[in-house]
């Protein structure tokens, strides 16, 4: 099971950041007490609103996130909990290479990855999705703790998330990765409703 705590570890306000860090530590503590193996999160933005801006993709933003996540990982190690980050194109850890850098700099077995292929995509790169997915599997595969499955369609010049199997995604590489390298991994279906549940299987 995964306990989600999707807050902004790059919040520039020191007071808010302290509260956010405390919330993460509390989630890790409760995860340990409840027998939840993973606390999951995304990687934030350089503004208080947690919105996309180009600075999110800067080296400075990545350094800020790495420094701010270190005490969280240290506590996860003490509590025996996996802390898994989910790369998202709009956020600081926006691609597989940046995720790999975080893993290498932290160098902790308690820091792992939630792999959501659609979250790595944007209107600017979705046509290269097969290459992006291959890169993610190559760079991050050993450290993936969970997979999120959904799909996307293009509407009004933007990607819109939809239930798995109802959009433009090709799952062949993802399914092969799961079968060959992570046969017992947990996979969750996102954007799934009673109306599309059968189709999403």
PLM regions and their residue ranges:
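H/E-rich (His + Asp/Glu) clusters that bind or coordinate divalent metals
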Residues: 167, 172-174, 179-181, 185-189
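Active-site acidic/histidine proton-transfer and metal-coordination neighborhood
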Residues: 9-113
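A short, acidic, flexible beta-alpha connecting loop/helix-capping segment that sits on the rim
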Residues: 188-199
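Acidic/histidine-rich catalytic cores of soluble enzymes
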Residues: 3, 66-168
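Short, solvent-exposed loop/turn segments at secondary-structure boundaries
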Residues: 12-18, 51-54, 124-128, 160-163, ...
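Hydrophobic residues within beta-strands of alpha/beta enzymes
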Residues: 1-3, 39, 147, 187
């Amino acid at each position: 099971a995964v306990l989600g705590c999707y807050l902004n570890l790059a919040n520039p306000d020191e007071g808010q950041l302290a509260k956010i860090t405390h919330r993460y530590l509390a989630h890790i503590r409760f995860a340990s007490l409840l027998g939840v193996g993973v606390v999951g999160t995304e990687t934030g933005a350089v503004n208080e609103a947690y919105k996309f801006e180009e600075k999110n993709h800067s080296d400075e933003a990545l350094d800020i996130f790495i420094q701010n996540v270190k005490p969280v990982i240290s506590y996860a190690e003490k509590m025996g909990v996996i802390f898994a980050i989910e790369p998202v194109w709009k956020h600081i850890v926006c691609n597989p290479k940046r995720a790999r850098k975080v893993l290498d700099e932290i160098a902790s077995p308690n820091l792992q990855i939630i792999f959501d292929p659609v979250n790595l995509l944007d209107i600017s790169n979705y046509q290269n999705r097969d290459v992006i997915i291959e890169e993610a599997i190559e760079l991050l595969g050993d450290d993936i703790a969970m997979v999120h499955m959904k799909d996307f369609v293009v509407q009004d010049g933007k990607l819109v998330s939809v239930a798995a199997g109802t959009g433009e995604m090709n799952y062949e590489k993802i399914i092969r990765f799961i079968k060959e390298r992570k046969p017992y991994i947990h996979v969750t279906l996102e954007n799934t409703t009673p109306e599309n549940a059968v189709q999403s299987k």
